[in-house]
């Protein structure tokens, strides 16, 4: 399925059904998830959870996972949490993303879990929070907030 066809399917389904279809493998992962290697593991109204195993392919020049990987993971989890609240035909886009990094990641960190949760969902704007934890230690890696614009059907 092409990325454009996947986007079209997302508009045909309500957001929760779409995220669950990704989670259950009924739809292919979006290109960014394939590129970075993260996957959805939970979805509920107002909530989305992803997992990633950090590897050397994610490294920056100083030998740790690039902050953009964590930021992308957080943006994805929080955005998908917002998406789970949307009816068919309604989309969203990130207006603002604020990430706080509290510890670095390396390939030795082991798998991480990223949870996104909606704080507020209005008619035109939604806000959400996200956190990344090391699965093995439970240590917080980063936390974030986002503001998303709700895109009404055309």
How does the language model describe each region?
Residues 1-154:
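Terminal targeting signals and extreme-terminal segments of soluble enzymes
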